[in-house]
Amino acid sequence: MKIGKQSAVLKNVYLGETAVVTGPKEKNGPLGRHFDKTYDKLHCNAKSWEKAEMQLLRDAIEICLEKNGLEESDVDYFIGGDLNNQLVIGNYVLREYKLPYLGVFGACSTANESIIVGASLLEAKFGRKV
């Protein structure tokens, strides 16, 4: 339900699980012990930054599915994006999965915009697992 000019209250939405995969700098920071998976090398054992980003996303998808006890077929929508305005990383990785993909680009706001889109789909009952 919309309240005011730019806010909404959602009543039937919750965050079931998360997965966080990082490189060495995050691993060595104050939150390092809380991440699901970390890499010791900056390129995550890949040959380029882009391939490293792809591996981080693959790992996060697999971990999140596992933590939720879900198969790909259980997911109604996968919503996400990256800092590249062509959504290259997400597009390349999601080709490997049978997940309906909705790419979002908002630069630094991509994560929050993705959550808002997913929550709205759930609230409207367009899906159960987003």
Locations of regions flagged by a protein language model:
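Active-site-proximal alpha-helical scaffold in enzymes
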Residues: 105-130
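Conserved "HGTGT" condensation-loop signature of ketosynthase/thiolase-family condensing enzymes
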Residues: 1-102
